[in-house]
């Protein structure tokens, strides 16, 4: 019998099938797994991702992204130089670049080459918008951005519609050239302890925007993956209704038992672990292995679960964390490949 690729094994779960082994979903390259084909890779338009590829700088809106040791290489908006201080004046500041003269076929070909995904082994996920909530916070910062949602709903709706028109034009012109296996919707609308917005505000502002994007995937039968960190379980029902098939990183601050009981294999959970826990210097290698085994036992017995256990190492010279990462990689492989035998 032919051996499944990582892609084939992962994509089985979108059909409600139990995979041959527990897949590993990653949000980027994983140290120690450079020679292993990832289950998923991402393609995004150059104009939207150029600042990330070059490790920082200004995005298309003028927001400057920087990295730091504390962010473990992640890019975040510069927190002392926001570009918008009054949402009612967004038209004076937020200027979408023209899309009129783009050769979409050629642009998509270049994007696919740049992402370096071997589609025979790895599922391709496409994405455009990096989240409407996140984008507003990047423009204004959390204090002014959250106040704007409460104080200036008309201006916020107008800004979001403007952004949505821009992003959906890009999706409309790229999706049939990319021909992705998966479609990503990304927005971090929650902190660890609570959502940043109420369910009512989520439905008023953000759900219609996600639904508009999701329709491109629904119309083509493309599975939809939803990324939202933090305690965002209150939004999951609505996201499933618009077609979401997978949620990452499904962090443990959520009631994951209740989510799995309700949706079973209909909603794949990718993650479900506590990366802070395994950085405890008192833990042995066996403790880490046992923790990951427990996650598999709790989440994977009926399928619908994917490991997303990746440690971002802020200090390349931190031998302890380098070792922990190696232990995690080995444990996930061994546990995952033996779980359904």
Predicted region positions:
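Short helix-loop boundary/capping segments at the starts of domains
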Residues: 19, 30-35, 63, 70
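Active-site loop segments of alpha/beta catalytic cores
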Residues: 1-29, 93-341
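A contiguous, low-structure linker/loop signature
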Residues: 54-102, 117-125
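Short, basic/low-complexity N-terminal boundary segments at the transition from targeting/disordered tails
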Residues: 24-45
């Amino acid at each position: 019998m032919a051996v499944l690729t990582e892609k084939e094994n992962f994509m089985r779960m979108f059909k409600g099938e139990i995979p041959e082994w527990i897949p590993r979903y990653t949000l980027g390259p994983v140290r120690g797994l450079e020679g292993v084909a990832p289950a998923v890779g991402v393609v995004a338009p150059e104009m939207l991702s150029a600042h990330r590829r070059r490790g920082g700088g200004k995005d298309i809106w003028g927001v400057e992204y920087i990295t730091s040791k504390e962010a473990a290489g992640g890019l975040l908006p510069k927190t002392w130089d926001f570009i918008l201080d009054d949402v009612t004046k967004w038209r004076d500041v937020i200027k979408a670049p023209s899309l009129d003269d783009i050769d979409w076929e050629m642009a998509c070909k270049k994007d696919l080459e740049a992402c370096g995904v071997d589609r025979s082994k790895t599922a391709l996920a496409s994405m455009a918008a990096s989240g409407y909530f996140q984008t507003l916070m990047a423009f204004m910062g959390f204090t002014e951005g959250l106040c704007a949602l409460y104080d200036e709903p008309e201006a916020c709706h107008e800004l979001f519609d403007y952004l949505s028109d821009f992003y959906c034009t890009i999706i409309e012109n790229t999706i049939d050239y990319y021909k992705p296996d998966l479609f990503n919707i990304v927005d971090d609308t929650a902190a660890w302890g609570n959502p940043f917005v109420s369910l009512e505000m989520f439905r008023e502002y953000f759900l219609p925007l996600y639904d508009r994007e999701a329709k491109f995937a629904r119309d083509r039968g493309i599975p939809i993956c939803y990324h939202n960190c933090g305690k965002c379980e209150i939004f999951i029902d609505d996201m499933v209704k618009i077609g979401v098939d997978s949620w990452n990183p499904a962090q443990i601050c959520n009631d994951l038992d209740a989510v799995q009981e309700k949706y079973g294999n209909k909603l794949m959970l990718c993650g479900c672990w506590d990366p802070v826990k395994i950085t405890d210097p008192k833990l042995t290698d066996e403790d880490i292995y046992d923790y990951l085994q427990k996650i598999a036992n709790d989440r994977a017995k009926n399928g619908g679960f994917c490991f997303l256990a990746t440690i971002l190492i802020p200090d390349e010279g931190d031998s302890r964390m380098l070792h922990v990462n190696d232990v995690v990689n080995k444990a996930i492989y061994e546990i995952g490949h033996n779980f359904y035998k």
